[in-house]
Amino acid sequence: MAGNKGRGRAAYTFNIEAVGFSKGEKLPDVVLKPPPLFPDTDYKPVPLKTGEGEEYMLALKQELRETMKRMPYFIETPEERQDIERYSKRYMKVYKEEWIPDWRRLPREMMPRNKCKKAGPKPKKAKDAGKGTPLTNTEDVLKKMEELEKRGDGEKSDEENEEKEGSKEKSKEGDDDDDDDAAEQEEYDEEEQEEENDYINSYFEDGDDFGADSDDNMDEATY
């Protein structure tokens, strides 16, 4: 091609001398030795103290950490539920204890409250009944009940009498209506019979031309 110099050789895109060696020189050998050690530090860490006191404090710290994790108010990150549940997780024991707070040591604002329904207004009937004089003695109560029963029986008897009178009046009106209907029906039947008799008695005398205008009795045609 016209852009390339020569055939079969590619031109370098950078200066080789800038890398540190000239043309024809060999590349440096690969170093297979470990790197040099980290230089010595001026400030070294303090050595750990050993003894019974230190071991006791370490054990106490671990126990405190475990007890804090077992408390019910310790927030744990929720585990992602896998599609396939492991058999071992099904029977794992939960070591958390149920925390029953002592509300004497905590403020009242933190205590949860259950919503209670407010009692509605009392019915008016109960108030009206309470306004009357209370009947304390049993004798007064019995007398009051007897009076009410007598009043109820009297009212019932009056109502029954009124119903009987109303039924009698209705029966009388019904009989009158039936009589009127029967009379009208008889008059209607008499009128029908008269009309039928008139049709039967409609005859012609001798010598009258019966059906003169009709075409059926004509022997010859008239022009």
Swiss-Prot record:
Induction: Induced by NANOG and POU5F1/OCT4. Negatively regulated by the interaction of microRNA MIR1305 with 3 miRNA responsive elements (miREs) in its 3'-UTR. Transcriptionally regulated by MYC. down-regulated upon cell differentiation. Residues 174-198, 205-223 have a biased composition (Acidic residues). Residues 114-125 have a biased composition (Basic residues). GO terms for cellular component: cytosol; nuclear body; nucleoplasm; nucleus; RNA polymerase III complex. Residues 110-223 are annotated as: Disordered. Signal peptide: none annotated. One of its GO terms (biological process) is transcription by RNA polymerase III. One of its GO terms (molecular function) is DNA-directed RNA polymerase activity. InterPro entries: RNA_pol_III_Rpc31 (IPR024661). Residues 140-155, 164-173 have a biased composition (Basic and acidic residues). Pfam families: RNA_pol_3_Rpc31 (PF11705). Barely detectable in differentiated tissues. Expressed in embryonic stem cells and in other dividing cells, such as some tumor cell lines. The modification Phosphoserine is found at residue 157. Belongs to the eukaryotic RPC7 RNA polymerase subunit family. DNA-dependent RNA polymerase catalyzes the transcription of DNA into RNA using the four ribonucleoside triphosphates as substrates. Specific peripheric component of RNA polymerase III (Pol III) which synthesizes small non-coding RNAs including 5S rRNA, snRNAs, tRNAs and miRNAs from at least 500 distinct genomic loci. Acts as a long tether that bridges POLR3C/RPC3-POLR3F/RPC6-POLR3G/RPC7 heterotrimer and the mobile stalk of Pol III, coordinating the dynamics of Pol III stalk and clamp modules during the transition from apo to elongation state. This is DNA-directed RNA polymerase III subunit RPC7. It comes from Homo sapiens. The gene is POLR3G.
